[in-house]
């Protein structure tokens, strides 16, 4: 007797990719994620490739992973994919210290963020 399959976390014509620890603040990551929301997958990859933001590299990797998941795991058409969701949240916070003058120290906070990208297959509109 085998265990039943886990229910899908996204819809039938959708694929998902998640990065749990992206180094950088969620605010900065959300600025880049906002560039691709609602765009076609190919256009979104181009936007991220030529973006000057440092976080664009991490967002591009997650988007490429979501596209690969759609193609290989769910047999979706890559040319018809649209970025349905690009959500950002807080992850862990590393705490470090820096030495200061007169024997004192200061706390340094190094934030991490989570990124969840969902792509879906959009049907071509008949004209």
Swiss-Prot record:
InterPro entries in the cross-refs: Ribosomal_uL22, Ribosomal_uL22_bac/chlpt-type, Ribosomal_uL22_bac/org-type, Ribosomal_uL22_sf
GO molecular-function term, one example from the UniProt record: structural constituent of ribosome
Top-rank taxon: Bacteria
GO cellular component: cytosolic large ribosomal subunit
Pfam families found in the cross-reference section: Ribosomal_L22 (PF00237)
GO biological process, one term: translation
Family in the record: Belongs to the universal ribosomal protein uL22 family.
Assembly notes: Part of the 50S ribosomal subunit.
HAMAP family: Ribosomal_uL22_B (MF_01331_B)
NCBIfam families per the UniProt record, alphabetical: rplV_bact
Function in brief: This protein binds specifically to 23S rRNA; its binding is stimulated by other ribosomal proteins, e.g. L4, L17, and L20. It is important during the early stages of 50S assembly. It makes multiple contacts with different domains of the 23S rRNA in the assembled 50S subunit and ribosome.
Protein name, as recorded: Large ribosomal subunit protein uL22
Recorded name of the encoding gene: rplV
